[in-house]
Every structure is written in structure tokens, then in C-alpha cells.
């Protein structure tokens, strides 16, 4: 089948129709299934043969997309995006996927596709080729392919979406890297950076699934802050956090910092955001996120993909206990952030050494002991006292926690 179709491919490009493209996509899907079957059976020779055919088909589709920009009129919307986004990354056969996939991630996010589900499907598919080919087949797969590709390129070890992140961990990094770079950009300019963060967070969020609200909200909150110097300050610490934290947690840190800043600057907006992110009553987490995000960051250092995302809610729940236990801590901590944005640089260092929610506090106290040592030591017991000085902030956090 594939050979016969391949022989038919050389037909004039003028004859290319939607049916032809659909046949090519169907064939690619069949090839992917065959490759998976042969891989499971250990038949490498057949896998190589089918992969070559698949690669040729993808290159052919990419050539059509490049030569005929008018193909959009012939192709349905999803296939068109696939042709535009997918072929470039697809034709590259995965090695360079990491690069294009990120671009396609932003594109797909801009298109409003659900990257998370796509990513999941893609990762479920397994091999890059499979996801790549599927990408050619449908826009969503394309998006997911890009995500998975970028994830693979950046670092498979990092899962970015809670449930999704487990399957999509690599993708998370790709999106995260984009997000981090964008956050850096954000640092450069608040409105633009916030916009980028929203886009990046949308990628990352889509990868993470539920986190979309939180991240998107975080950028939104940042946007709400607009050009507030506080948000810039938050961004500065964010950038260091993100580099050290490898992306997803970085985003959260930055966002949380934003939130904390937002708390101080635009508390009202921050509240709805956190609540939105945790509509299921995790609102307190959102606020606690500022503190536990650090913990999650530390965890992300330990096992960035699993803890941060696998935890997803579980982390939140785990951290909830720790956070709720250290809710005052969180409150004070976020408060610390307000007064001690200076400590953020130190915190960044603290984040690096901190490996785990509990260890975070200890490590923060240790590495950041100067800054957080007093805060967290007091947080553990006297946190209530510190919270008292920050009674208004506590009230906010209390609301969130509630």
C-alpha cells in the first residue's frame, strides 16, 4: 500500500487535492501503527523501512505545504495547520523537533488548540515518529507532537502537566523553556512580557492541563499589575528561579512571586486568579502556591516532572498539608516575598539546594536562613506572630486558603 502510494506521489503537484492529502495522512497513520507493531516485535529492519517511507511522506507533505501556500483553501482547517506547523517539524524527523515544536507550540496555543490533550495523545503514541506522523494527520496531534518533540529536545525527564505532565513531562520543558525565555522577555518589558508569559503559560498550562488557569492567571495578574514595578521585581527573581528550577516550577515561582506581588499590589485580582486556578477549593493553594511553589520547585529539583506535575493536585494536597501546616508560613513567606523580594535572589539559591517541601523550609532557612531563617523559623512556630504584622496579608491568604 505504502509503496504503491509512494509511486503515485510523484504526480504533478497541481493534482494534489484534499483527498490526496488525506490518503497520505491515513497512510502515515497506518505506517505508524506498523512501526509500533514491529518495534514491539523487535523487527528493526521492517521498522527502518517503514520509517523511511514515513519520512518520505512527511517530506512530501512538507514540500506541498511550502510550495503551495494556497493549500489552505484545499485542506480543512486542522490539516492546514498540520501542514503549516507539522511538516517543518515532521520532516525533520524528530532530531530538530525540539526546535520547531516549540514554535508550533506557540502557534498551536495561539490557534487555541488544547495542547495538553494533544500532548497526552502524542506521548501516549510514544515514538517521536508516531507523534510526528500523527501530527501531520491532525492539527491537535501536530501540536502535541511539537510539544512532545520539544519536550524530548529539551529534556525528557521533565514532566510538565499534572496528569498530563506525566505523559507530557518532556513537552513541559519545551514549553517551559519557551516560558522561561519569555519570562525573561517579560522581565524586559512588563506588558509584553506578561503577554508572552500568558502565551507561554498557555502553552505550559495546556501541557499541564489544570495549571493553565493558574499560569494563565498568573500572567493575567501580572498584566493586571501592568507596569507595576513590583511585578518587574517579581519577574527578576522569577528569571533566576526559572533558570535554576528548570521551567515549570520556574513559571510557578515567577507567577507566585507575581501573585505575592499582586497580593501586595493587586490583591483583589490575585485572589480571583488563585481561586480560578483552584476552583475546586484549591484557592488556598494558589495563595499557598507562593510558598509551596517553592516547595514544589524544590521537588521539581528533586524530581521536577513527577513532583510538580504528578503532584498536580496530589502535590497540592501533599503540599497542602505542608502548606496548610505552614499556611502561616506561606503567608509569612509570601509576605517575606513582599518585604524580602531582595531575599528572592537568596531564595533562588535556596530553591536550588531545597529538595522537597519539608527540606525547602529547612534549606531555605539554611541557605536563605538570613532571609527566611527568621521568617521560617518563626513560621514554624511564631509564624502566627509574623502573620499578625501582616494581618492584612494573612486575611488575604486566609481567604485564599479558605
UniProtKB/Swiss-Prot annotation:
Residue segments, region Methionine-rich intra-molecular domain? 149-238
Q: Where is the composition biased (Low complexity)?
A: 85-106, 233-251, 311-375, 390-402
* Example GO biological process: positive regulation of DNA-templated transcription
The UniProt keyword set, sorted, is:
Activator, Calcium, Centromere, Chromatin regulator, Chromosome, Kinetochore, Nucleus, Repeat, Transcription, Transcription regulation
Molecular function terms in GO for this entry? DNA binding; DNA-binding transcription factor activity
InterPro entries found in the cross-reference section = SS18_N (IPR007726)
Q: Give the region (MFD domain) as residue ranges.
A: 252-323
Tell me the compartments it is located in.
Nucleus; Chromosome, Centromere, Kinetochore
Q: Which stretches does the entry tag as region Necessary for interaction with CREBBP and for the recruitment of CREBBP to the nuclear bodies?
A: 393-402
In UniProt terms, what function does this protein have?
Transcriptional activator which is required for calcium-dependent dendritic growth and branching in cortical neurons. Recruits CREB-binding protein (CREBBP) to nuclear bodies. Component of the CREST-BRG1 complex, a multiprotein complex that regulates promoter activation by orchestrating a calcium-dependent release of a repressor complex and a recruitment of an activator complex. In resting neurons, transcription of the c-FOS promoter is inhibited by BRG1-dependent recruitment of a phospho-RB1-HDAC1 repressor complex.
Q: How does it assemble?
A: Homodimer. Dimerization may be necessary for its function in neuronal dendritic development. Interacts (via C-terminus) with CREBBP (via N-terminus), EP300 and SMARCA4/BRG1. Interacts with the nBAF complex. Association with CREBBP facilitates transcription while the association with SMARCA4/BRG1 suppresses CREST-mediated transcription in resting neurons.
Name of the protein this chain belongs to:
Calcium-responsive transactivator
Give the species this sequence originates from.
Mus musculus
Amino acid at each position: 500500500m505504502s509503496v504503491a502510494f509512494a509511486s503515485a506521489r510523484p504526480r504533478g503537484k497541481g493534482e494534489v487535492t484534499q483527498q490526496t492529502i488525506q490518503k497520505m495522512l491515513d497512510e502515515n497513520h497506518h505506517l505508524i501503527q506498523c512501526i509500533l507493531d514491529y518495534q514491539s516485535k523487535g523487527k528493526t529492519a521492517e521498522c527502518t523501512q517503514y520509517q523511511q517511507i514515513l519520512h518520505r511522506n512527511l517530506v512530501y507533505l512538507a514540500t506541498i505545504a511550502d510550495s503551495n501556500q494556497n493549500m489552505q483553501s484545499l485542506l480543512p482547517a486542522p490539516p492546514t495547520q498540520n501542514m503549516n506547523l507539522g511538516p517543518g517539524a515532521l520532516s525533520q524527523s524528530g532530531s530538530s523537533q525540539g526546535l520547531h515544536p516549540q514554535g508550533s507550540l506557540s502557534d498551536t496555543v495561539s490557534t487555541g488548540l488544547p495542547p495538553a490533550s494533544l500532548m497526552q495523545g502524542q506521548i501516549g503514541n510514544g515514538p517521536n515518529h508516531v507523534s510526528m506522523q500523527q501530527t501531520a494527520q491532525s492539527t491537535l496531534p501536530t501540536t502535541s507532537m511539537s510539544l512532545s518533540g520539544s519536550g524530548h529536545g529539551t529534556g525528557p525527564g521533565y514532566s510538565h502537566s499534572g496528569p498530563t505532565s506525566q505523559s507530557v513531562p518532556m513537552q513541559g520543558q519545551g514549553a517551559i523553556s519557551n516560558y522561561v525565555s519569555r519570562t525573561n522577555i517579560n522581565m524586559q518589558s512588563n506588558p509584553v512580557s506578561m503577554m508572552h508569559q500568558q502565551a507561554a503559560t498557555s502553552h505550559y498550562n495546556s501541557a499541564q492541563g489544570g495549571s493553565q488557569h493558574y499560569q494563565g492567571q498568573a500572567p493575567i495578574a501580572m498584566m493586571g499589575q501592568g507596569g507595576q514595578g513590583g511585578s518587574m521585581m517579581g519577574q527578576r527573581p522569577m528569571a533566576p528561579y526559572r533558570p535554576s528550577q528548570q521551567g515549570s516550577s520556574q513559571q510557578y515561582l515567577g507567577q507566585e512571586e507575581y501573585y505575592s506581588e499582586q497580593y501586595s499590589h493587586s490583591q483583589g485580582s490575585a485572589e480571583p486568579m488563585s481561586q480560578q486556578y483552584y476552583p475546586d477549593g484549591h484557592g488556598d493553594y494558589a495563595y499557598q502556591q507562593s510558598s509551596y511553589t517553592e516547595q514544589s520547585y524544590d521537588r521539581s529539583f528533586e524530581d521536577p516532572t513527577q513532583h510538580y506535575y504528578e503532584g498536580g493536585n496530589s502535590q497540592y494536597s501533599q503540599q497542602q498539608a505542608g502548606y496548610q501546616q505552614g499556611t502561616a508560613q506561606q503567608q509569612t513567606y509570601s509576605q517575606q516575598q513582599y518585604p524580602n523580594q531582595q531575599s528572592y535572589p537568596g531564595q533562588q539559591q535556596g530553591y536550588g539546594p531545597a529538595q522537597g517541601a519539608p527540606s525547602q523550609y529547612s534549606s531555605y532557612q539554611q541557605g536563605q536562613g538570613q532571609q527566611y531563617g527568621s521568617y521560617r523559623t518563626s513560621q514554624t512556630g511564631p509564624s502566627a506572630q509574623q502573620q499578625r504584622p501582616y494581618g492584612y496579608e494573612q486575611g488575604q491568604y486566609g481567604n485564599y486558603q479558605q
